[in-house]
From Swiss-Prot:
GO MF terms held by the record: GTP binding; kinase activity
Pathway(s): Cofactor biosynthesis; coenzyme A biosynthesis
Role noted for this protein: Catalyzes the GTP-dependent phosphorylation of the 3'-hydroxyl group of dephosphocoenzyme A to form coenzyme A (CoA).
Signal peptide: none
InterPro entries xref list: GTP-dep_dephospho-CoA_kin (IPR007164)
Name of the protein: GTP-dependent dephospho-CoA kinase
Organism: Methanothrix thermoacetophila (strain DSM 6194 / JCM 14653 / NBRC 101360 / PT) (Methanosaeta thermophila)
UniProt keyword terms in alphabetical order: Coenzyme A biosynthesis, GTP-binding, Kinase, Nucleotide-binding, Transferase
Amino acid sequence: MRVLVLPEELRDELKEPLGVLYRCHGVECVERMSDHLRAAERVIAVGDITTFYLLKASFIPDLMIVDHKTKRSPVEDSIKRRHLEGSYRVVNVENPAGTLTEELLDAVRESLNGCTPTEIIVDGEEDLAALPAILYAPLGSAVVYGQPSVGSVLVMVTPEKKREIEGILRRMTVKEKV
């Protein structure tokens, strides 16, 4: 099984937002980006807190990618429970920190090819999951993820954004997992 590993030289680059940074928190961020979310082909949420506030604001993402952590610490039970309230397909995958496993990549691709809202629960870390979400999402989709201690990032999926993500993924180190 193939694993993409984040090289040291990409770490600083990926700390920069991939889309528009909304300097706000919680439902306020969702409200500020709501026109884009309503117009989006699909809505993808990456991260437990991002997913929580989208659900709280009554936006049901087509795909939610969570790891039950925020800033490397477990999320509160109330946040986990909010995720469980919906009726959607649940997929469990492994994805160690600083990587994108083939298992996660396949789960994102398959989820975005389907019609059923899906929650991917990552054992490990989902920090890089916005990359395949952008790559595999239909054009016109919105990918939302948190920028720790700053706000939320909204990425509208365009052909140019997909090419940018392909370039980033090509620069990651490929390893074979036994």
